[in-house]
Amino acid sequence: MLTVVYGHPYDKSFNAAIKDAILAALAKEGPEWSLIDLYADGFDPAVRAPELALYSQGRTSDALAQKYMDILSRTDKIIYIFPVWWGTEPAIVKGFHDKVLLKGFAWTYSPEGRLMPKLKIRRTVLFTTSEAPTATFSAYFTHYLPEHVFAAVGMQGAAWHNFDHIPRSTPEERAAFLKLAAREAAALIK
C-alpha cells in the first residue's frame, strides 16, 4: 500500500495543490492507498510524559500515533508533502517521526547493539516547498534524513523534489511541478 503523509495547515497553500494533484493521480490508478493528514487529523506532535514512559516498550498512549503505526505496518511506499520551515520539516512532521517510528515497531537493536530497521518501505518520496534555493537544504534532505532517519527504520529508496522560490514562482512553474508530482505518484502506485 502507498501512504501519503501530509503536513501543512493551510488548505489554499501550494502544498495543498501538490497533495490534491497526487491524490487525483492515485485515485485514477485505483489500488489501495492511504492519506495521513496530520493537521486535519488534529495530530499533537509533542511527546508527553505518559508517552515517553511507554517509548522504550515500543508503545504509545496516543490513539492517532497508534493508528498511523497500523497504517505504516501495511505501507510499502510512502510520499511526504510538507513545507521547509527553518531549513527542515515542520514540527508536526518531526513529531510524527518521534511518536510513530518507535523502537520495537519501526526499529530495534541486534544482539550486538546495531540498529535494525523493521519497516518494509521500498520507496520514500518527499515533495517540499521553500522560499530559499533548494541547494540551501540539499545536505539535510539528500543525506541526513534519508541516511539517519529513513534508512534507520526501513524507509528505502529516498527521492526528494523541492519547489523553491515559492513567492516568486510563475503559474507555469507551479503547473510543471504539479505535473511532476502527479507523474511520480502514478509511477509509484503501478
Task: Please report, for each region that a protein language model flagged, where it lies by residue.
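Residues at the starts of beta-strands that form the adenosine-phosphate
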Residues: 1, 32-34, 122-124, 156-157
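N-terminal beta1-alpha1-beta2 submodule of the flavodoxin-like/Rossmannoid cofactor-binding fold
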Residues: 1-105, 109, 168, 172-190
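Short, histidine-centered active-site or binding-site loop motifs used for metal coordination
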Residues: 6-8, 128-131, 164-167
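Short, structurally constrained coil/turn elements
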Residues: 27-29, 120, 154
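Hydrophobic residues at beta-strand termini and immediately following loops
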Residues: 36, 127, 161-163
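Structured loop/turn residues at beta-strand edges in well-structured enzyme cores
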Residues: 73, 91, 119-122, 156
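Short, glycine-/small-residue-rich phosphate/pyrophosphate-handling segment
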Residues: 108-152
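Glycine-rich phosphate/pyrophosphate-binding loop and the adjoining helix
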Residues: 136, 143-190
